[in-house]
Amino acid sequence: NLYTTTHLFKRHLAQYFCPMTASQQLTVAEIGVFHGHSTAVLAAVFHQVIAVDVEESYLRLASLQTNGSRNVVFLTGDSGADRWHAFRSNRIDAVVIDADHRYESVLADISNALSVKTVKHFAFHDYQAAGVRQAIAEFEERGALVNCQAIGSGWDGSAWYDGWNAETETKVSEGRLCRRGKLGNLAPSFVNKTFYVY
């Protein structure tokens, strides 16, 4: 099912983050929760989870999946709009991005996440979507995202979803896991900003 994360994706997230969270109290922002299956895993791994979705109904479902975990905060909002100012005043160590898969939206989500200086780790779902791949590739080329690795189904280059095209989608995994790189060559984000010209 392309609409939710696979067990392998969730296992790879846990394997990556558990060693870090064993010695530190880390916070993750999950952007796009759908039914909350990944949210439940993140709640078991992280000290604090901030789950954001534009659909209130998805947040209600996610709340049921997490069985009322006290370490999960649910927020309704459009992650593409620059409402990350609230996050900038908090310590967020990791971001899981699985919201709107259009190129411009993923670009905005990554830019907004990079504006939170404490974010060191990025996980992306639906890497098979062209907009997701293109946006991540641009940040990798700039050096803003480094040490990226494939996670979830297809991490080994195997076919894993209906519609998989062996000629154009070799080595396309379900997700991608990256670390923050040097940001010296990143231009500021002007997505969803208002300008007045006089």
Regions found by a protein language model. Give the residues of each.
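A short alpha-helical cap/connector motif
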Residues: 1-96, 100-198
